[in-house]
């Protein structure tokens, strides 16, 4: 494996923020000591997201970043989980970091974890937890309230003790993560939950780490509507796993 870390970034209709957040991502990663690659995965966007990323890659060729930035794109929107799976499967790195393009968690969070030696065991998954006692969160009360309700649902449905499954900032090791995502069948709202359940079954330890998280304006998440869809996905997942 040539790269030490791959950053997988799923994209769906993000044309308005691609330029700003992509530049922030690569500027931060270029300051890391280890080698890296960034894989953008365009999950069937119907806006100009694909062209914006291609333009970004072209602009950065002058800075010798072209070998470190890749774009995977396909026409049909399948879901965030599928996009992350596609990125993971072409990764050539020891470690894989997934993060959202809106930069609710800044990529420098990974470096903070590394400096504190919180990431070391290859048989663990490291998940940013907005409920961790040392996390610094800037969000509305209703989001925090819904997070607490979700925690209760996950425990009652799956006996899952992970307090925050949905933060997109996660670090996995290549020794297990491709096998895990090869088994995933839920590609939409509940894919994180299914991945964590599969990791538990495979004796992969889930470690929740503190994070600085800010709700960004322009986010594509519709709180109430997406919460309902997420709950329905959990019902489908529970029924499938109960067979």
Which role does the model predict for each range below?
Residues 14-29:
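Short, well-formed alpha-helical segments that are part of the catalytic scaffolds
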Residues 21, 49, 84, 108-111, ...:
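Acidic donor-diphosphate engagement hotspot in glycosyltransferases and nucleotidyltransferases
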Residues 14-17, 45, 80:
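Donor nucleotide-sugar binding loop of glycosyltransferases
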Residues 34-45, 72-73:
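Short beta-strand/loop segment that forms part of the nucleotide-sugar
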Residues 74-90, 95-98, 107-189, 215-232, ...:
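Acceptor/aglycone-binding surface of glycosyltransferases and processive sugar-polymer synthases
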Residues 1-5, 16, 20, 152, ...:
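Hydrophobic helical membrane-anchoring modules
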Residues 38, 71, 125-126, 206:
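Hydrophobic/aromatic residues located in beta-strands of well-ordered beta-sheets
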Residues 42-53, 103:
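A conserved acidic beta->alpha catalytic loop
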């Amino acid at each position: 494996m040539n790269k030490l870390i791959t950053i997988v970034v799923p994209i769906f209709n993000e044309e308005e923020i691609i330029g700003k957040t992509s530049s922030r991502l690569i500027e931060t990663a270029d300051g890391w000591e280890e080698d890296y690659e960034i894989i953008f995965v365009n999950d069937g966007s119907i806006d100009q997201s694909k062209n914006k990323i291609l333009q970004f890659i072209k602009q950065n060729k002058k800075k010798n970043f072209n070998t470190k930035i890749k774009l995977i794109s396909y026409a049909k929107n399948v879901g965030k989980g599928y996009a992350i799976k596609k990125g993971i499967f072409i990764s050539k790195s020891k470690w894989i970091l997934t993060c959202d393009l809106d930069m609710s968690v800044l990529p420098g969070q990974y470096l903070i974890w590394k400096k504190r030696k919180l990431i070391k065991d290859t048989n663990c998954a490291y998940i940013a937890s907005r409920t961790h006692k040392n996390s610094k969160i800037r969000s509305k009360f209703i989001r925090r309230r819904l997070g607490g309700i979700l925690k209760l649902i996950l425990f009652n449905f799956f006996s899952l003790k992970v307090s925050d499954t949905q933060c997109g900032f996660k670090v996995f090791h290549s020794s297990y993560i491709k096998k895990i995502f090869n088994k995933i069948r839920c590609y939409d709202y509940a894919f994180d939950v299914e991945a964590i359940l599969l990791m538990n079954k495979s004796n992969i330890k889930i470690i929740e780490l503190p994070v600085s998280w800010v709700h960004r304006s322009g986010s594509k998440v519709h709180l109430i509507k997406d919460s309902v869809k997420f709950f329905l996905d959990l019902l489908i997942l529970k029924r499938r796993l109960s067979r």
